[in-house]
Design a protein with these regions (language model features):
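Glycine-centered recognition micro-motifs in short, flexible terminal segments and loops
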Residues: 1-16
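Charged/polar positions on well-ordered alpha helices
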Residues: 7, 44-51, 116, 120, ...
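C-terminal juxtamembrane segment of a hydrophobic transmembrane alpha-helix
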Residues: 15-32
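Juxtamembrane extracytosolic/periplasmic "stalk" immediately C-terminal to the first targeting helix
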Residues: 37-44, 66
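Short, conserved structural patches
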Residues: 55-188
Length: 188
């Protein structure tokens, strides 16, 4: 009985199986890396957009603090409301300030900054593999006068088409990946 022929058949059967496992491992690794990169890009864009809002929020609070500091304070009759701590920025804001934080000029600036940071992280909407880049600010249902809403949120959603090796052998050479990043800032 010759074993050489049996070994050759076993090797011939195992090589395609081994190559299939290798292709699956390479595809899974590539998808994992692309998805993580997309997630980091979405989160960086959301953080950049909310930083514009935070900067404007501080500007509004400092203006209000300056007004309070320059106003003479005689002893008024009745009870007084406590002055907020200087570091508690959101306590200095009123509903008009909260409305200014979601007005069109600031909304446009926040969205533009989020898009800029998405582009800096490799997500350029003009690239054909970027299927979708959506920025939602403020969150749905936000009302500046509603005291039950404690935070302003920005949500960045990205969808990118990526190439896969094994799926190409099976007829599908692309896969769509989605990621979302959300940042928020307290406003009450």
């Amino acid at each position: 009985m010759k074993r050489r022929g049996q070994v050759l058949i076993v090797v011939a059967v195992l090589i395609p199986v081994l190559l299939l496992f290798l292709a699956v491992a390479v595809d899974a690794g590539r998808i994992f890396i692309d998805r993580a990169s997309l997630q980091r890009s979405a989160q960086a864009a959301a953080d950049a957009g909310i930083s514009v809002v935070a900067e404007h929020m501080v500007t509004l609070a400092v203006a209000r603090q300056t007004i309070m500091a320059s106003t003479p304070s005689p002893t008024p009759p009745g009870t007084m409301t406590a002055t907020p701590v200087l570091s508690n920025i959101q306590a200095w804001l009123n509903d008009e300030d909260r409305q200014a934080l979601t007005a069109d000029p600031l909304r446009g600036t926040a969205v533009a900054e989020a898009i800029h940071y998405a582009q800096r992280n490799g997500v350029d909407p003009s690239q054909p593999e970027i299927l979708r880049l959506e920025i939602h600010y403020p969150q749905a249902g936000y009302d500046p006068g509603d005291p039950s809403i404690h935070a302003l949120r920005i949500l960045v959603e990205i969808e990118r088409r990526t190439t896969v090796l094994l799926a190409g052998l099976l007829g599908e050479s692309f896969m769509d990946l989605e990621a979302a990043g959300q940042s928020e800032i307290p406003q009450r």
